Amino acid sequence: ELADELRHVSLSGGKRVRPTVTVLACETAGGSPEDAVDFGVGIELVHNASLVVDDIIDQSEVRRGTAAAWSEYGYGPAIVASDGLLGEAFALFSSDPQAMQIVSEAMVELGEGEATELAAQPTNEHEYMELARRKTGALFRAAAELGAVAADADAYTVEALGEYAERVGVAFQIRDDVLDATADADDLGKPTGQDAEMDRPSVVQVTDLTPAEANERAKTEANAALDALSTVDGGNTDAGEYLEDLARFVVVRER
């Protein structure tokens, strides 16, 4: 049954943005995509594990157009599935101490972000941006840094790609908040209006920004990501160009 639960969570679709970042970062840093596959799978499993918990906290019954794990199997089995995903993920990172450190630090940031969202909600734009960095940016950063590590990149390249991805992650979260407030649930593949219904901090709820102004903030983050990427030697490769495209895409996506 646990295997069914793991398959339900990990094979139910999704954008697979984080593993894509891992593979592209590896190529941009001079590595082969094959070198980054394990790390890419691992970071997606970590992300999926966090979504299981998110859905329990939010009481969201739908994820990626299908039943959320807790809705399908119950709270206990869903939590066990989340633990199982993390176990599988760390098995993929365990051969590389640097990878273990990167992911562990990202998970601490992610946990702090979730705790902040529940217990000490942000009250202004600055606090919101810090929440977005922890809640979403940290795992994006880890995805890119893992790719750079897989390519045996130097510390400067690891940091530059990490900065790029963290900024993309923040832009992604801002756009996610805007979509929650403005998109159609069927188009988005998950319930909308959740932030307002649950009094959950979002860029729309916390600040006085209109959706259009929030989108501009997302574009500012995307531009900062592009600036960071421009300092990487491999930024003009095909993989680097795909990373550029991603930074531009996350702020205009519709789901």
What are these regions (language model features)?
Residues 1-255:
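All-alpha prenyltransferase/terpene-synthase fold signal
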